[in-house]
Amino acid sequence: MAASRTRSWLRRTGGVLMALLCLFLIYELAMFSMVVWYAHRDPGSSAIMREEISRLRETDPKAQLSYTWVPYDRINVTLKRAVIASEDANFTEHDGVEWDAIRKAWAYNQNQQAQGRATIRGGSTITQQLAKNLFLSGSRSYLRKGQELILTYMIEHVMSKERILELYLNIAEWGVGIFGAEAAARHYYGISAANLNASQSARLAAMLPNPRYYDKHRSTRYLNSRTAILLRRMRMVDIP
């Protein structure tokens, strides 16, 4: 009798696990289909945009995002160089994830936390940030991070580096309700993304880690220092 109950429990457990595996595979297939779609189609919005407009409309039901898609060749090369210099210096060389950078960021953040400092460093590549911004929420969990890694490898497998950077620059957050290079250039400088100069591009790139804060605090010591550093570094950056 006990052996029969054990076999019955194992069958039920096996059935549940198989059903969960099938659901997981169906979900990942759907995500892969979306990655393939965006390899050839420009998104009208993104997960991070939908999250932000919901947040803004909690206090202002009529709130709108500032977002205009522009093709890769209408974004000034200086912004491409500055963003890569700021966010992912090895963008053209890696396969989507830089494990050494993640380990170094983790060690740095642990040290900052031990000293009671709020400054943190991210280890995510441009492709990882794109996966998060385009498909996922801003919440933090091990499950979400795992899905981000899966999407990152999907994106790198399907898309060219140029397409990845084009998507990233067009959906990156650059302030409160400000998304994409074109909207950022017009919001901060009153010009198109095609007409940005090196100094303007470096400052926009320096804002990326905390764009909502720097939208309201546009001349902090850190932002000025980071802009100067990027101006020097961006000349040595390779772009796709």
From Swiss-Prot:
Enzyme class, first EC level, given as a word: transferase
Transmembrane segments: 16-36
Enzyme Commission (EC) number: 2.4.99.28
GO cellular component: peptidoglycan-based cell wall; plasma membrane
Subcellular location: Cell inner membrane
Example of a GO biological process term: peptidoglycan biosynthetic process
Gene Ontology molecular function, alphabetical: pentosyltransferase activity; peptidoglycan glycosyltransferase activity
Domain of life from the UniProt record: Bacteria
Pfam family, any one: Transgly
Catalytic reactions on record: [GlcNAc-(1->4)-Mur2Ac(oyl-L-Ala-gamma-D-Glu-L-Lys-D-Ala-D-Ala)](n)-di-trans,octa-cis-undecaprenyl diphosphate + beta-D-GlcNAc-(1->4)-Mur2Ac(oyl-L-Ala-gamma-D-Glu-L-Lys-D-Ala-D-Ala)-di-trans,octa-cis-undecaprenyl diphosphate = [GlcNAc-(1->4)-Mur2Ac(oyl-L-Ala-gamma-D-Glu-L-Lys-D-Ala-D-Ala)](n+1)-di-trans,octa-cis-undecaprenyl diphosphate + di-trans,octa-cis-undecaprenyl diphosphate + H(+)
SUPFAM superfamilies associated with the record: Lysozyme-like
Gene3D superfamilies linked: Biosynthetic peptidoglycan transglycosylase-like
Keywords per UniProt: Cell inner membrane, Cell membrane, Cell shape, Cell wall biogenesis/degradation, Glycosyltransferase, Membrane, Peptidoglycan synthesis, Transferase, Transmembrane, Transmembrane helix
InterPro entries for this protein: Glyco_trans_51, Lysozyme-like_dom_sf, PBP_transglycosylase, Pep_trsgly
Pathway assigned to this chain's UniProt record: Cell wall biogenesis; peptidoglycan biosynthesis
Topology of the protein relative to the lipid bilayer: Single-pass membrane protein
Protein family (similarity comment): Belongs to the glycosyltransferase 51 family.
Task performed by this protein: Peptidoglycan polymerase that catalyzes glycan chain elongation from lipid-linked precursors.
PANTHER family: BIOSYNTHETIC PEPTIDOGLYCAN TRANSGLYCOSYLASE, MONOFUNCTIONAL BIOSYNTHETIC PEPTIDOGLYCAN TRANSGLYCOSYLASE
The protein, known as: Biosynthetic peptidoglycan transglycosylase
Source species: Bordetella avium (strain 197N)
Taxonomic placement: Bacteria, Pseudomonadati, Pseudomonadota, Betaproteobacteria, Burkholderiales
Gene name as annotated: mtgA
